[in-house]
Amino acid sequence: MKYDLIIIGSGSVGAAAGYYATRAGLKVLMTDAHMPPHQQGSHHGDTRLIRHAYGEGEKYVPLVLRAQTLWDELSTHNEEPIFVRSGVVNLGPADSAFLANVARSAQQWQLNVERLDATALMTRWPEIRVPDNYIGLFEADSGFLRSELAITTWLRLAREAGCAQLFNSPVSHIHHDDNGVTIETSEGSYHASKALISAGTWVKALVPELPVQPVRKVFAWFKADGRYSTKNRFPAFTGEMPNGDQYYGFPAENDELKIGKHNGGQRIQAQEERKPFAAVASDGAEAFPFLRNVLPGIGGCLHGAACTYDNSPDEDFIIDTLPGHENTLVITGLSGHGFKFAPVLGEIAADFALGKTPSFDLTPFRLSRFSQ
């Protein structure tokens, strides 16, 4: 059987692509080396932030606004919401370049963002402590996503729509010819007109020339109480320290507050190098500078986990066809800020399989930018 689209890697982007392409009437085969959702890829742990006024650059705003529409639609397929509108407060020095980008994005796209000085911040959320030179940019319409629920929902909807799914079966080789794309797996060979490579952190095992660097990252849960929960209107947050370190975190659930450090980490080359949480001496203390100064009421570390970023050289996404192979789309290099975009990236992949022109300017995400 020849498929219209084969998806290599069925985590967040691949799961979304499988659903949207199958819903559009295409014959789709989703593959994964493991059984998604799993803990081997870039994303695991149950929550991910979604921010609209985007500190990483205005080029992302149209994508994240479309993603929000798709998240809201996906949430209708479950009793438990996938998106929780907790609000997100971005904290940092008043001269922060990241916060300047957030403010610029908000102004250009007329987003609901409120600017608070240090006094106003600490009045609204007495749990937060910041220096006098800090500000907060509060996005009331943003919040967080239940990531594993999202992936399982896409997988279920795709399967119910007739999508073929081949999991626990790594792809060992990809072949291109005039008739399309052939993949080799432990279960045999499969052929399609087009392919999506969304293999996340370990994409270089299949496409070694891609400029993607895996980085081991950790996050942890700390003892909290009801003051830090959504029931008390405590928001999700990003925070920049005076030395430039970037942190992110979520409202407490079951008296546990999850926090991670966005920058830093350990460069690795293979999956077995991703040691578990606490295997690196700094793991347990990584969040202390932020917690001690900004959230001093939070208690000790309860447990943690390790994940992996698939970093591009400039930490912007890679969304492009493989050089010399216009029938194969690669979505990678999401650099630790990609999950919130998963539905729109999946939709872009489905449009690629349908032969449609993208609805967005993807020029900033082309591979050619690295050869200029």
Curated annotation (Swiss-Prot):
This enzyme's EC code(s): 1.5.3.-
Alphabetical list of Pfam families matching this protein: DAO
UniProt KW keywords: FAD, Flavoprotein, Oxidoreductase
A GO term for molecular function: sarcosine oxidase activity
Gene3D superfamilies assigned: D-Amino Acid Oxidase, subunit A, domain 2, FAD/NAD(P)-binding domain
Cofactor binding, note field: Binds 1 FAD per subunit.
Residues reported to bind FAD: 4-34
Cofactor(s) the protein needs: FAD
Class in the EC hierarchy, top level: oxidoreductase
InterPro entries in the cross-refs: FAD-dep_OxRdtase, FAD/NAD-bd_sf, Me_Trp_Oxase_MTOX, MTOX
Superkingdom of the organism of origin: Bacteria
GO cellular component: cytosol
UniProt KW Glycosyltransferase keyword: no
Catalytic activity: N(alpha)-methyl-L-tryptophan + O2 + H2O = L-tryptophan + formaldehyde + H2O2
Keyword Flavoprotein carried by entry: yes
Residue list for modification S-8alpha-FAD cysteine: C307
Its biological purpose: Catalyzes the oxidative demethylation of N-methyl-L-tryptophan.
Family: Belongs to the MSOX/MTOX family. MTOX subfamily.
Subunit-structure text: Monomer.
Protein name as annotated: N-methyl-L-tryptophan oxidase
